[in-house]
C-alpha cells in the first residue's frame, strides 16, 4: 500500500503532508515553499500555471487568474452574489444553477479548478516521496454543507486521487496538537480562521480518542474579508485625494489586493506600514501614485465588525457542547488569519487564557490530515487512535405546511443512521414527495435543499394510515444517503445525496482524463522550455565564437554550420515542435560547435603547438574544443527549473 497524503485545500493557500516513520512531515513544493497558493492562471497561449507561478503574474493577467475558488465550490449561483462581485475573473451560471468560471472560450467548474491545485500538490508529493501517490485525506471547513463536501471529493477524483476521507479542518488541527498528548484528558477549543472560512470546534481528548463535542462557524468569513476592508479603504482614500475611482480597473484592483494582504501581514508584527503603489493609474495630467500609511489601530477599526463576528460561533459551540468557558482547558489557533493581534486578543479575553501556540497555524490542518491518513493506512504509531467527528448542521424533511422536521440534529457523532416514520397527508395518496433539507431554520424553504425524490406505488388508504419509514444515513465523510420504505407494499426508493448541479460519475471520469492529458501537456511544455534554455546557451556560445573568431573562419565551414544554426533557431519559435526534435537539433548543433571549437583552437594555438609536447597539445586541444560544451552544461544545470512565462513577475 502506497503512502496516504493529507491535504489542507485552503481558500488562499494549500498544504500537503505525509506520515513518515510515525511522524507527520510537511512536503515542500517544487518552488521550496511549505504552502502553495490556491491560485490557477491561464497564459496567453493557453499554458496553465498553478501556485506561486500563477500568483506572480496575477497583476498583468487578472481576468485569467482564478483565486478563492473554494468560496464557490458546491454553492449555487444565487448564494454567491457577494463573492462574484469581488473577483476579477468571469463567473457564469453553470448547470442546475451552480457557478462556473469562464476563461476565454471555455468554462470550468470549481471542482476542475480545485483539482488543478490538488494535482499540483499530488505532483509535489510524488517528487518528494519518489513514488506514485493515489490516495489522500482532504480537509474541509467544519461548516461545509453536504454539497460542498461532495464537490471537494469530486475535485480529488478529477485530480486522480482516491479520497479516503473528508475530515473537518478543526478536527484535523486537534489531531496535530494531540498526537503526542494521548494520555492527557482535556477539553480543547479549536479556533480556525483561514483565508475564506471560519470554524470553531470543541473536542474532548483522552485515551487515544478525539471526540468532537460541537462545531459552529461561518463559511463567509476569512482573511480575504480583512483584505477587502483595506482595499475598500484604499479605494475611498484615493478617490477622495485624486477624484479617480479605481474600482473598475481590474489591474489596479489586483495590485490593491496584493498590497492589502501584504499590509495585513506586516501589521501583525508592527504598528504601522506604508502602502506605496507607483503608477497605479493616470489621467490627462499624467501618472498617479498611491502612497498611504496604515496603522494597526486604523486596521482594527476597519475590521472591527469582522473580529466581533467570530464571537457568536464561539459562544454557540460552547453552549452546544453543554460546557462553560471555564471548562475549556486549551485554546488552539489555526489558520493564518489568527496571527491578527485583534483576533488573538478577543480569543484571550473570551476564553480567559492565552491560546496554545504549539502548532503551526498554516500547517496544523495538513499535518492532522496526514495523521488521519496514517490511521486509515494502519500505521503502527497511530493505528489505535479513534476520531469521532460530528455533522455541523441538522438534516431533515419538509413535512405538511412547509415545516422542517429534523431527523438528525446538528453535532451528532458520525457515522450515524436514524429512521423516522411518516404518513400521507391526504386520502388515497399513492405518491409521497420527499424533500431533504440541511439547516436550522423552522421553515423548510429557509434551509438548503439537498435533494428531492418520490416514493411511488403506495397502496391507496385514508390519510394517516400508510406507514413510511424514512432513514437518514451519514457516512464518516459526512455525506448523506436517504431511503424511504412503504411498510405495506415494501416499495423502496433511495438517493445518495450529491450536490444538485454536481458532477455525475461520467463527468468526473471525463474531467479526470482531461486533467491527466493537461498534466502530460504541461510536462511536455516544461520539457520544451528547459530544452530551449539549453539550446539558447548553445546558440549564445556559437554567436560568441563567431563574434570573436568569425573573420578567421573559412566560408566553407560557415556555410556548413549555418544551416544547423538556423534549424536550431527555428526550433526556438516553433509552437508545434516536439522535445525529441529539439534534442535532435541540439545534438547536431553540439557536433557543429565541437568542430568549430577545434578549428578555432588550431588557428589560435597553432604556433605554440610547434613548441609544445604532443601530449600537452592533445590535452590543450581537448580542453579548448570542449570549452563551449562545458559552459553550456553549466548553464543547463543552472536553469533546470526554469519555466517560460509570457507575463511579468511582480513581487
From Swiss-Prot:
InterPro entries: ATPase_NBD, Chaperone_DnaK, Heat_shock_70_CS, HSP70_C_sf, HSP70_peptide-bd_sf, Hsp_70_fam
Entry annotated with the keyword Protein biosynthesis: no
Induction: By stress conditions e.g. heat shock.
Pfam family, one: HSP70
Family per record: Belongs to the heat shock protein 70 family.
Function: Acts as a chaperone.
Xref: HAMAP family: DnaK
PANTHER family to which the protein is assigned, alphabetical: HEAT SHOCK PROTEIN 70KDA (PTHR19375)
Protein name in the entry: Chaperone protein dnaK1
Protein source organism: Thermosynechococcus vestitus (strain NIES-2133 / IAM M-273 / BP-1)
Amino acid at each position: 500500500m502506497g503512502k496516504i497524503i493529507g491535504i489542507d485545500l485552503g481558500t488562499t493557500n494549500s498544504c500537503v503532508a505525509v506520515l513518515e516513520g510515525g511522524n507527520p512531515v510537511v512536503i515542500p513544493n517544487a518552488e521550496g515553499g511549505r504552502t502553495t497558493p490556491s491560485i490557477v492562471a491561464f497564459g496567453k497561449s493557453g499554458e496553465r500555471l498553478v501556485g506561486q507561478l500563477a500568483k506572480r503574474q496575477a497583476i498583468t493577467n487578472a481576468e485569467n487568474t482564478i483565486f478563492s475558488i473554494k468560496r464557490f465550490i458546491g454553492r449555487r449561483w444565487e448564494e454567491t452574489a457577494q463573492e462574484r462581485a469581488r473577483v476579477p475573473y468571469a463567473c457564469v451560471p453553470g448547470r442546475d444553477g451552480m457557478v462556473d468560471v469562464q476563461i476565454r472560450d471555455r468554462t470550468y467548474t470549481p471542482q476542475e479548478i480545485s483539482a488543478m491545485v490538488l494535482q499540483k500538490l499530488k505532483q509535489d508529493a510524488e517528487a518528494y516521496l519518489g513514488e506514485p501517490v493515489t490516495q489522500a485525506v482532504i480537509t474541509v471547513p467544519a461548516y461545509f454543507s453536504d454539497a460542498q463536501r461532495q464537490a471537494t471529493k469530486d475535485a480529488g477524483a478529477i485530480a486522480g486521487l482516491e479520497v479516503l476521507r473528508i475530515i473537518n479542518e478543526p478536527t484535523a488541527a486537534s489531531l496535530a496538537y494531540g498526537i503526542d498528548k494521548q494520555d492527557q484528558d482535556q477539553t480543547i477549543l479549536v479556533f480556525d480562521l483561514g483565508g475564506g472560512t471560519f470554524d470553531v470546534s470543541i473536542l474532548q481528548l483522552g485515551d487515544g480518542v478525539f471526540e468532537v463535542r460541537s462545531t459552529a462557524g461561518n463559511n463567509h468569513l476569512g482573511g480575504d474579508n480583512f483584505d477587502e476592508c483595506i482595499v475598500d479603504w484604499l479605494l475611498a482614500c484615493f478617490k477622495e485625494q485624486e477624484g479617480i475611482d479605481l474600482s473598475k480597473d481590474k489591474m489596479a484592483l489586483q495590485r490593491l489586493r496584493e498590497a492589502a494582504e501584504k499590509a495585513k501581514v506586516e501589521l501583525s508584527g508592527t504598528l504601522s506600514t506604508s502602502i506605496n503603489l507607483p503608477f497605479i493609474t493616470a489621467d490627462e495630467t499624467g501618472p498617479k501614485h498611491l502612497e498611504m500609511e496604515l496603522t494597526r489601530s486604523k486596521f482594527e477599526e476597519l475590521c472591527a465588525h469582522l473580529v466581533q463576528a467570530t464571537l457568536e460561533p464561539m459562544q454557540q459551540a460552547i453552549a452546544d457542547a453543554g460546557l462553560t468557558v471555564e471548562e475549556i482547558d486549551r485554546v488552539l489557533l489555526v489558520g493564518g488569519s489568527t496571527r491578527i493581534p485583534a483576533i488573538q486578543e478577543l480569543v484571550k479575553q473570551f476564553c480567559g487564557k492565552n491560546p496554545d501556540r504549539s502548532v503551526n497555524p498554516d500547517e496544523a490542518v495538513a499535518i492532522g490530515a496526514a495523521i488521519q491518513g496514517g490511521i486509515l493506512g494502519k500505521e503502527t504509531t497511530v493505528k489505535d487512535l479513534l476520531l469521532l467527528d460530528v455533522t455541523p448542521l441538522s438534516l431533515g424533511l419538509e413535512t405538511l405546511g412547509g415545516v422542517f422536521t429534523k431527523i438528525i440534529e446538528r453535532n451528532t457523532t458520525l457515522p450515524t443512521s436514524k429512521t423516522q416514520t411518516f404518513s400521507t397527508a391526504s386520502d388515497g395518496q399513492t405518491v409521497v414527495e420527499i424533500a431533504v433539507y440541511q439547516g436550522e431554520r423552522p421553515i423548510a424553504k429557509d434551509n438548503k435543499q439537498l435533494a428531492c425524490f418520490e416514493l411511488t406505488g403506495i397502496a391507496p388508504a385514508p390519510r394517516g394510515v400508510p406507514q413510511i419509514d424514512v432513514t437518514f444515513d451519514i457516512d464518516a465523510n459526512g455525506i448523506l444517503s436517504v431511503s424511504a420504505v412503504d411498510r405495506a407494499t415494501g416499495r423502496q426508493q433511495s438517493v445518495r445525496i450529491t450536490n444538485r448541479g454536481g458532477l455525475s460519475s461520467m463527468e468526473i471520469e471525463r474531467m479526470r482524463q482531461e486533467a491527466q492529458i493537461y498534466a502530460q501537456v504541461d510536462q511536455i511544455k516544461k520539457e520544451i522550455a528547459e530544452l530551449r534554455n539549453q539550446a539558447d546557451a548553445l546558440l549564445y556560445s556559437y554567436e560568441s565564437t563567431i563574434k570573436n573568431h568569425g573573420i578567421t573562419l573559412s566560408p566553407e565551414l560557415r556555410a556548413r554550420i549555418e544551416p544547423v544554426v538556423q534549424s536550431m533557431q527555428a526550433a526556438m519559435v516553433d509552437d508545434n515542435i516536439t522535445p525529441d526534435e529539439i534534442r535532435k537539433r541540439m545534438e547536431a548543433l553540439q557536433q557543429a560547435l565541437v568542430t568549430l571549437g577545434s578549428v578555432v583552437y588550431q588557428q589560435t594555438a597553432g604556433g605554440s603547438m610547434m613548441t609544445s609536447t604532443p601530449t600537452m597539445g592533445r590535452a590543450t586541444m581537448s580542453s579548448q574544443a570542449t570549452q563551449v560544451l562545458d559552459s553550456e552544461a553549466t548553464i543547463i544545470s543552472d536553469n533546470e527549473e526554469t519555466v517560460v512565462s509570457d507575463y511579468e513577475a511582480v513581487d
